[in-house]
């Protein structure tokens, strides 16, 4: 990735490359996705912030997406499965009428930023890899006001909503503990 962080604005879901040509405006939402390496171990985190006063529609999107992340984290317990995490996220997002991005998902985290297993933001309870103590995963719902469908822009990095509607992204790296 050519940037130090990912900075994605409004309908940009992930992998926005920071640029001096992008001027934030009152009412925008800005997702910042960062990683860190400490003593050879990786951490990954994202948060979506309001720029000044935002519309009630965008405020609700941020609130629901953050709720999705916390519900996914709550489901990340030994003995549960990846499908339990995805189901918890999907249920909240779709109940709110939002689209759950499917092409981009959470992931295992360790010595590398993206390791197995993939951690989808959608799924069925009691399916997928069983969660065991010692696993470290990034749970990162990407939720769209409109459709879940995405498009990759011409730079080959930036991913936007296909319908141009806003998207929010919240992420935490969590360890599964006994």
Locate each region found by the language model.
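Active-site neighborhoods and metal-handling regions in enzymes and metal-associated proteins
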Residues: 1-178
């Amino acid at each position: 990735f050519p940037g130090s962080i990912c900075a994605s604005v409004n309908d940009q879901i992930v992998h926005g490359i920071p640029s001096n040509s992008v001027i934030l405006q009152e009412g925008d939402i800005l997702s910042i996705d960062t990683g860190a390496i400490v003593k050879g171990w990786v951490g990954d985190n994202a948060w979506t912030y309001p720029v000044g006063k935002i519309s009630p529609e965008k405020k609700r999107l941020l609130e629901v997406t953050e709720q999705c992340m916390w519900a996914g984290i709550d489901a990340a317990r030994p003995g549960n499965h990846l499908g339990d995490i995805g189901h918890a996220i999907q249920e909240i997002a779709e109940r709110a009428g939002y689209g759950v991005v499917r092409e981009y998902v959470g992931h295992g985290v360790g010595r590398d930023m993206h390791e197995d297993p993939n951690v989808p933001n959608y799924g069925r309870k009691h399916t997928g890899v069983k969660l065991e103590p010692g696993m470290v995963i990034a749970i990162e719902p990407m939720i769209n006001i409109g459709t879940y469908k995405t498009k990759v822009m011409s730079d080959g990095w930036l991913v936007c909503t296909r319908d141009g509607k806003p998207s929010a992204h919240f992420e935490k790296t969590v360890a599964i503990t006994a």
